[in-house]
């Protein structure tokens, strides 16, 4: 496939998404990050169904439990996006919960995200993020920081432009 063909991929079905906010302080009314992800991802050119939206505490067992529930559900998810818990404080454990579940890590996501964060958003504070992405079988997982600026950057510049292509690639041998 040539570059221009990747940009024209349109799936003949909705993209099924789950959003997980990781925070000790947010609830559904105050969770600006989770709400922003919903808003931005719904603007994707392909139809998107937000199948699940949850908030869990900054606790590795709680995060892992919720992710495993979604990953083993009979309703196949295409994408899980987490927000929060990607920094360097003792309570930031999202990466420790996500990484062991990944079949393949998309190293380029974290590299590009930190580069764009450095050049377009927070400068050298980009060093503090450990945002990652990868796959767990045929599900994409993105672990994003909790700040709305970081969420907007990741969704607009990295996730939305490649979402249909990523979902297509993960499912072409399974569903076609």
UniProtKB/Swiss-Prot annotation:
Biochemical pathway: Cofactor biosynthesis; molybdopterin biosynthesis
GO biological process, one term: Mo-molybdopterin cofactor biosynthetic process
CDD domains found in the cross-reference section: MogA_MoaB (cd00886)
GO cellular component, one term: cytosol
Keywords: Molybdenum cofactor biosynthesis
Family: Belongs to the MoaB/Mog family.
Chain's role: May be involved in the biosynthesis of molybdopterin.
Protein name: Molybdenum cofactor biosynthesis protein B
């Amino acid at each position: 496939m040539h570059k221009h063909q990747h940009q024209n991929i349109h799936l003949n079905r909705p993209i099924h998404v789950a959003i997980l906010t990781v925070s000790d302080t947010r609830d559904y009314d105050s969770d600006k990050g989770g709400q922003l992800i919903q808003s931005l991802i719904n603007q994707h050119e392909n139809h998107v169904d937000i199948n699940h939206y949850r908030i869990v505490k900054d606790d590795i067992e709680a995060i892992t439990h919720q992710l495993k529930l979604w990953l083993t559900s009979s309703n196949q998810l295409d994408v899980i996006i987490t927000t929060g818990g990607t920094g360097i404080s003792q309570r930031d454990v999202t990466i420790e919960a996500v990484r062991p579940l990944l079949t393949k890590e998309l190293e380029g996501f974290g590299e590009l995200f930190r580069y764009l964060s450095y050049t377009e958003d927070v400068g050298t504070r980009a060093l503090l993020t450990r945002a990652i992405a990868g796959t767990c079988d045929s599900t994409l997982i993105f672990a994003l920081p909790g700040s709305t600026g970081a969420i907007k950057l990741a969704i607009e510049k990295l996730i939305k432009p490649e979402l249909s292509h990523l979902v297509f690639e993960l499912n072409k041998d399974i569903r076609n």
